């Protein structure tokens, strides 16, 4: 389950409009967080550094992480 990507999630849903691709990013992060929690593995927290603005405090998702995932998925 940790190998499920945001693209896998979007594909499973029959595709997502570009404006909603962030939803699959959040879905992938939520799945990863749930697996880590189930296994008792602590999640890394977001520190105020060069990671950019914190977008999702529940999962510690920064703006730069979302941008990175979008760039990776566009290849």
Swiss-Prot record:
GO molecular function: iron ion binding; iron-sulfur cluster binding
Record's keyword terms, sorted: Nitrogen fixation
Disulfide bonds: none
UniProt keyword Secreted, yes or no: no
The keyword Glycoprotein belongs to this UniProt entry's keyword annotation: no
Entry's family note: Belongs to the NifU family.
The protein's role, per its UniProt record: May be involved in the formation or repair of [Fe-S] clusters present in iron-sulfur proteins.
Protein name: Nitrogen fixation protein NifU
Originating organism: Nostoc commune
Gene that this sequence comes from: nifU
């Amino acid at each position: 389950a940790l190998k499920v990507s945001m693209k896998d999630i979007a594909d499973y849903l029959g595709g997502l409009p570009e404006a909603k691709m962030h939803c699959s990013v959040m879905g992938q992060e939520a799945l990863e967080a749930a697996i880590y929690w189930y296994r008792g593995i602590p999640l890394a927290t977001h520190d105020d550094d060069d990671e950019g603005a914190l977008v999702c405090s529940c999962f510690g998702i920064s703006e730069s992480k979302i941008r990175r995932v979008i760039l990776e998925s566009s290849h």
